[in-house]
Amino acid sequence: MSILHDLAATIEARKGADPDSSWTAKLLAKGPEKCAEKFGEEAIEAIIEAVKGDRAKLVSEGADVLYHFLVMLAARDVALDDVLAELAHRQGQSGIAEKAARPKG
């Protein structure tokens, strides 16, 4: 997971950077809504490649999805470790039991 932590740290460092100096800084400067929109676009592109069955393009789009997910988290000040902790908490539970235990509403 080191690469994801490294990428998350780089994204976090770009928060205060000049938007003209970095794509990440430019995206973050546009706000969390734009970051979420871009994540959604990349997720759809990955879905399309998964349906097509193009492995190389799916790998590439998957990398874009991970990057934009981390940008979206950073835009809302959510740490990657918080998401990983939630995954760790769910590990070992059946998906059905985990979903049933979620708060309603």
Swiss-Prot record:
Origin superkingdom: Bacteria
Pathway: Amino-acid biosynthesis; L-histidine biosynthesis; L-histidine from 5-phospho-alpha-D-ribose 1-diphosphate: step 2/9
EC number per UniProt: 3.6.1.31
Main location: cytoplasm
Catalytic activity: 1-(5-phospho-beta-D-ribosyl)-ATP + H2O = 1-(5-phospho-beta-D-ribosyl)-5'-AMP + diphosphate + H(+)
Top EC group: hydrolase
Protein location: Cytoplasm
Organism: Ruegeria pomeroyi (strain ATCC 700808 / DSM 15171 / DSS-3)
GO biological process terms on file: L-histidine biosynthetic process
Entry's Gene Ontology molecular function annotations: ATP binding; phosphoribosyl-ATP diphosphatase activity
NCBIfam families (alphabetical): histidine_hisI, PRK00400.1-3, PRK00400.1-5
Keyword check for Nucleotide-binding: yes
CC terms in the record's Gene Ontology section: cytoplasm
Family annotation (CDD domains): NTP-PPase_HisIE_like
Annotated keywords: Amino-acid biosynthesis, ATP-binding, Cytoplasm, Histidine biosynthesis, Hydrolase, Nucleotide-binding
Protein name: Phosphoribosyl-ATP pyrophosphatase
Family from the record: Belongs to the PRA-PH family.
